[in-house]
Amino acid sequence: MNLAQGKKALLSAVAAAALTVVGAASAMADVKPVTIRIAADLTGPPHPAGISMSLFKELVEKKMPGSEVRLFFAGSLYRIPEAVEAMTDGNLEMTWGQFGKTAAVDPYMNVVVGAQLLTTPGAIDSLDSFETIKFLQDRMNKVHDVHIFGSGHLSMYMGAGSGSRLISPADFKGKKMRSMGPAENALLGALGANPTTMAFGDVPPALQTGVIDGLLTSLGGFNSTKDQAPFFTIAGINGIVGDYYWIGASNSWWNKLDTEQQAILNGIIINEVLPFQKKINFCNDKRLVDKYETKDPSKPGIYIMNAAEAGAIKTAAGTATADWIKSKTPDAANMWVDKFAMEAAAAVAANPVGSSDLEKTDCAAMAKWFTTYERYKKPKKKK
């Protein structure tokens, strides 16, 4: 190839690359923008789910130019039950929901809630393959006109936070404890505590003023309340609480989108946001345990119960959660409570600790995300 031919080939390659860029930009410009309000009961960054919601906003606004995604954290627009009703009525586009909290509008959503069922990371990561989840997706679609894309992970180390250490059932007795939902109330009741449900955004002032003595929450929740509840106790993976996020959209809104809009949003949620959320949640658990773990239960920090201590909680709780769920749902739901327990046991057996790809996540590479987005500050209430 002579100099002239080489120059011509180079110019052709540059032109082709330019056309590719222009074509991609043109394709993006052809996509109709969307306006999405997404309601959540969790707090914003650095909470891992809050970071994931912020990533969702960034990706939608980048891939669908002209779009606007408005994030409503900590129940600032709707709490989860009201958000579901708003989606059913066509008054809200999307919700980052939670199964246990959704039970207030559909008791069936409780069938996947319960401690010491999914007790390995790999088992939790296989949740979307469960027949129970597919049943709930179908039910939400038919009964509430809500499309659930998939599930997300709460902290695998859900636990109990307080101003003093809660380890034995006796430590819980008489304590006013914030619960995440009615299913957890049954567990707390079995331990002798006085449970109350409230949105997470209301928790810090309630702790500070003594309205509650402690709370059930995630490690992300502990990180937000460690000044008010510095003693956080966990009983292994899902040892005290077992609940999960779901991400859904109003069919009333979703069905008005064209196929290209739906494909882009579905790809963002399924292929990018949900896998990212599970990884950053895993890494958040790891970094917080690494930073705040204490082996001395008399000192503040994250204390992981030994087998005997966790066993005492499990014995005291008994079948309280499953019994409560069965008592509050139609008889037809009982089979799904039992089905989920069987699916969970099979998933744990198939995914022992250390075997999942999730546990191989490079958390050093994920560290930057904890400072990527502006730290969330709860808006001050107007006087």
Stretches found by the model and what they are:
Residues 2-14:
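Bacterial N-terminal signal peptides that target proteins for export
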Residues 14, 30-123, 147-383:
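N-terminal secretory/targeting leader peptides
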Residues 119-143:
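Short, solvent-exposed loop/beta-turn-alpha elements that line the ligand-binding surface or hinge
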Residues 12-23:
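Bacterial N-terminal signal peptides
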Residues 23-29:
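Sec/Tat signal peptide C-region and signal peptidase I cleavage site
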